[in-house]
């Protein structure tokens, strides 16, 4: 029985397979493909009108559909392909869109034919008419064909010709929506929102225009009233309101630094300075925390009793110490002022030159500075600023100037500044710069010079908080450093501000040896300089320890807490002094101990502001291997003196401009957070004035150096020792070859890698070779002609 069942099931399976195969054979009837190929061939013949059959097919479609027959060809081909492969009629949104598009094109073709042919289009295209048309022309124009004719004839009486046009546009839009497979509701919603937004913006623009027109009317009325008042007061003044023509006799307001000098001598200046600011945030100690902070400050001082700090090693506050008076500085000699008539003449020449080149502008103001004269140009509406900047050389030629610097635009002003060098640079002395401000409450206030307007410029170091000074040799960099140091000596006592001076050139800052403000003697050895900077880093970390234990955030809050503690407990705990570190030539330090110096500068510039430690770095080689990206990013304030190329200027201040400076103290200053440069003529300070101030300070108090801050003495070459017996031979080999590497020692002495590495470490520790700098070869620091070799 089981075998019989198996045989019956096997028979059923075979019969079902035969049925499916027979169905497939029926479905895969080749007649369908033959018909599809035939339709495609006929459509191609009709489209290209190939032979008698092609012309007959095209004539038939032309009679039915007119100019819209080309879309009909495409739709027939697409439908044939779809039906052949899918074996069903397409029923999609795109199919409906194609049909709607065909109807819309019938309307469009017939409307175009109606407007172009007139009465001819109104004739019914019966077969006799069609036959006559083909006798006169191979391809007569039937517009939308028979279908288009009857569609238009039926629609015009119902909805008029204008209504047919609207219906046609709607059909075209609907076909596009269907073909792109979108919903009419969504498209309508987006369209309405866009229309609303457009109307809203249009209303806003119209209201703004009305307000502007109203303001212009009020402004014109006000100007007319002012003009009438001026004419009543001064009837002899000519009207120069015409912007295109510049009268030669027009007086331009002139401001000069010579007038400022006379004003400053007669009365104190009430003008607020550009860079003066009050730093009053995060420094006030709350009264209800006084008891807790007293205990914290006692614990802090007890915890650091075993260490010799700057306060303990330094001097006791000298009550009798008096800051040097400004009378020690020389009074500036009277100099020949720049002729105002000559400046007026150049202003008229500048206007005429711009006018000759098609630039409509006028000189609204002239500022005579110590080194340059700035002509403030106000261009007319529609004049591009770049057009004025591109006339740089032509302006210099017309004014017979050595060079011209264009500031376009002047920050905060709707004007362009053209800076022309004076025939003679006026000397700016440090005394006239400090006369109005000193003595200052800010002990780190330093004088820089005078700006283009002739106003004295002083800046607080604690707001910089670090400064980069760079420029070529002889541009005034060392004078600027001397002016900064002298400003500190004239304003701060030794217990208020401490100095650390690093001078690898050995001649610039040696005059300050012995002043009580110094932490250590002036450092001239580059190796000691790197160690001195590391000592400053250690002092910074110690101060942050104090701030942490006393719950204060910076040096100002800590000193306020100490003063309050001294008043309440009648004690004399020393306050933390500000420390200013000045490096006069960074390039020499980077060449000898670049890695250590860069790391120390990075730590100081990143963290030392709150600790009251400020760094001033000067160099005469503003290249990227000296002013590295790390140093540049961490020093926000920069002073650029005259340099030789725009590349050097970009290295210092990030933009060009320093290459057009005149030298002799002419500088560009970029403050912390400022996006624009300020041109300043640096204050001059003679060597005798520096010596007089130093003598006055030293006579009152001698220097009391902090031994803990002094760098370690360099290793004596005669005492260099190494446990390796090959050290002497390796030493001589490296000095002779003037190159050193671990692989070189391995090959020369046939030793392993570990021993060669230890020899390299010994040579570096004994200052025979420099530190490793990535893939670059190590520098040999000892010459073959050295006596020690």
Swiss-Prot record:
Coiled coil: none annotated. InterPro entries: AAA+_ATPase, FtsK/SpoIIIE/SftA, FtsK_alpha, FtsK_dom, Ftsk_gamma, P-loop_NTPase, WH-like_DNA-bd_sf, WH_DNA-bd_sf. Residues 1-25, 209-275 are annotated as: Disordered. The chain crosses the membrane at residues 34-54, 63-83, 99-119, 137-157, 158-178. GO terms for cellular component: plasma membrane. It holds the Pfam family FtsK_SpoIIIE. Residues 454-650 form the FtsK domain. It comes from the Bacteria. One of its GO terms (molecular function) is ATP binding. Residues 179-789 are cytoplasmic. It is found in: Cell membrane. The keyword tRNA-binding does not apply. Signal peptide: none annotated. It is a multi-pass membrane protein. Homohexamer. Forms a ring that surrounds DNA. This is DNA translocase FtsK. The gene is ftsK.
